[in-house]
Amino acid sequence: MHSLKGDFVSNNVTISHCHLPLSPATAIAIIICFRIVTDLKLSRLTYAFYLPGPISFLPVIPI
């Protein structure tokens, strides 16, 4: 759980770091979007990561 959440944070930092020099506004929007999605859906997405295949994400993400 903690390692998974750490991966989310690392990915957000990496994405924002790559886009920050090009478009700060875009980077901020990405950070906010990822934070909201992570906060609201992390508990729902957690079990999906342990299930095989991308099919497990389909019923979870649109909720």
Curated annotation (Swiss-Prot):
Keywords: Membrane, Transmembrane, Transmembrane helix. The chain crosses the membrane at residues 15-37. It is found in: Membrane. One of its GO terms (cellular component) is membrane. Its main location: membrane. It comes from Saccharomyces cerevisiae (strain ATCC 204508 / S288c). This is Putative uncharacterized protein YLR402W. It is a single-pass membrane protein.
